[in-house]
Amino acid sequence: MKIVMYHYIRKFNRKLPFFKNFLKKKEFVKQVNYFQKDKGIIKNINEIKYNKDKYLLTFDDGLKEQIFAAKILAKKGLTGIFFIPSLPILEKKFLDVHKIQILLAKIGSKKIIEYLNKNKLYKLSIKNIKKKDVKKFIKAYSYNKDKKSNILFKKNMNYLINSVNRSQILDEMFTKFKITESVDKYYMNVSDLIYLKRLGMKIGCHSHSHNILSKMSKKNQFKEISKSKKILEKKIKKKIDFFCFPYGRKYSYN
């Protein structure tokens, strides 16, 4: 079985001039049509056990724009698994991983690096990065063809700087650069998840905060995953049977 993972499916937005890592809607439709003609796409999750050649389509992060993809799949009698982090559902807040994406998309890495070079908390956080983490996450984003400055910012923030300092730095940057993105427009809400369920889509959990699990104790890993599962099950009134690791690389969860 081939698993194809999606995040951003949208058209170019002039308000996000530096954001290019997305799939155009028409390209998504082309891909679905190709997968259908090739080996076929999973129509029922029970098929997973018996269809080694078919494609399974998955969608991470609970992004509002993914509703478009769900509608396309439903029209074709297909299904996909949508992996939802529960913090935006529960607290109506941006995940740090998406604050990073929004900053890069709106103002670009050049201005970000210029700002961070003058930020005392950022410089202190860089000094306090643990050598074992640098070694553990040496391959982070090595597969990525993004700009080096983008990769540096994402790697430091997502993998190396401690989460408390990271959140504070990102919040300061949102204020400094007057970022006014809407959480409600960015993420799916409970009504959207129930709508996906009606369309025949499957809901899975994607942790609570989308933080690096391999930096947590086993106890906190359990809390992070079980909390997400409980919140989603309570909200959509359906058992959650699927889980997808944030980031997905072995070093991010092992």
Where in this protein do the model-derived segments appear?
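Catalytic alpha-helical scaffold of carbohydrate-active enzymes acting on polysaccharides/glycoconjugates
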Residues: 1-242, 249-254
